[in-house]
A protein has these predicted regions:
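Non-catalytic cap/lid and distal C-terminal segments of serine-dependent acyl enzymes
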Residues: 1-361
Length: 361
């Protein structure tokens, strides 16, 4: 601004040029400041370990969706709601390529949790228009915090990853059930029930399984049911398998964690856990596996040294459960905390979960 004042009397053209230069300088300084902030956040949270991983993630709708996705609540159109009232479900507007199955939207009201939310279901190739999924195995698919359930299907490209495995007979046909995890936005539920808070655990462990069995006609809960998730959903998946092995015979945590991650977004959960040691224990996957182990543990724990959010927590969990059977680590190099990493891990994860599921229908 001092340059502008000293030049003020030297002609309009000079003033315009200097003003433009000042404006450009301000814009550039803001861009550099934002770039620096992004680099600091990326350094601390490990979204993109390399420039190439950043370039690969550019195809995502929002590569930061696991932790920064604005809540959409999975809003449904009037036409979709009309179809659901008539036949119980509506086809999603965005479908996978032909031959890769079909996405269906449902609205589920949980009696025990008091929650009503969207559930997306993927019907495998050959079962797209079946009245139900009689006898098929089930995989629950759980997304991250603040990422609406719609992202679980589309950003993960779930159908495009799962369908080729079925066609090549590497895994049996199965139904993917994708319930809304974020049932009380903007509060992060941590998949936990607690007094005065949302009954998020009951929604996932009781209501949605009961609905899936009744509505979809799938095989009964047990060895042929499994659950996978990433980030927050990875914690939920690990906890559901450890605490509900009679429902979920196997589980997979992709760059998740293994005990509640409490902060300003989790409401009163931190104080509740501090006052209630029993709830704190029931929410700790390592404690559950050490003290109340399933008859048969089958848990996959995927992480990457490049992921600052999950690597240390996963190593701590593996150390705390060392010697316990049925826990399989999966290390992926240079995998940031992005949909790109979870997409790439999906084929190996599904093969792990469905290896012994078999196919009956």
């Amino acid at each position: 601004m001092l340059v502008y004042r000293r030049s003020a009397g030297r002609g309009t053209g000079r003033r315009v040029a200097v003003s433009a230069g000042v404006a450009v300088s301000i814009v550039l300084s803001q861009v550099l400041a934002i770039r620096g902030l992004v680099l600091v956040v990326n350094r601390d949270f490990g979204f993109f370990p390399t420039w190439s991983s950043l370039a690969a993630a550019s195809e995502d709708d929002n590569p930061f969706a696991a932790v920064a996705q604005p809540a959409s609540g999975g809003a449904m159109t009037t036409d979709e709601l009309k179809q659901i009232r008539v036949r119980g479900w509506a086809p999603r507007k965005v479908q996978p390529p032909k031959g890769d199955g079909l996405y269906r939207d449902y609205v589920v009201s949980g009696v025990q949790s008091g929650t009503t939310a969207k559930v997306v279901v993927w019907m495998p190739p050959g079962h797209e228009h079946a009245a139900n999924a009689k006898g098929l195995p089930v995989v629950f698919v759980l997304g991250g915090a603040y990422g609406p359930v719609d992202n679980v299907a589309t950003s993960l490209q779930f159908a495009q990853k799962a369908a080729p495995l079925i066609r090549s007979k590497q895994i049996p046909p199965f139904v993917a059930v994708m319930p809304e995890v974020n049932i009380k936005l903007p509060q992060d539920t941590e998949c936990t029930d607690y007094p005065g808070g949302p009954q998020a655990y009951t929604w996932l462990a009781r209501d949605v399984p009961a609905w899936a069995q009744h509505t979809l006609g799938v095989v009964q809960p047990g060895p042929r049911w499994s659950v996978l998730g990433w980030s927050l959903g990875g914690y939920c998946a690990a906890k559901l398998h450890a605490a509900e092995p009679q429902t979920f015979g196997s589980g997979a945590s992709l760059q998740g964690y293994f005990a509640p991650s409490v902060d300003g977004s989790t409401g009163t959960l931190a104080s509740v856990l501090q006052r209630d040691p029993a709830l704190r224990q029931r929410s700790d996957v390592a404690w559950l596996l050490r003290n109340r182990p399933p008859a048969r543990t089958r848990l996959l724990a995927m992480s990457s040294p490049a992921d600052a959010q999950s690597w240390q927590l996963t190593q701590q969990f593996l150390g705390a459960t060392k010697g316990l059977p049925g826990i399989t680590p999966m290390v992926v190099d240079n995998a940031g905390h992005t949909y790109t990493a979870w997409r790439e891990a999906l084929p190996r994860t599904l093969t792990f979960l469905l290896k012994d599921a078999g196919a009956k229908g």
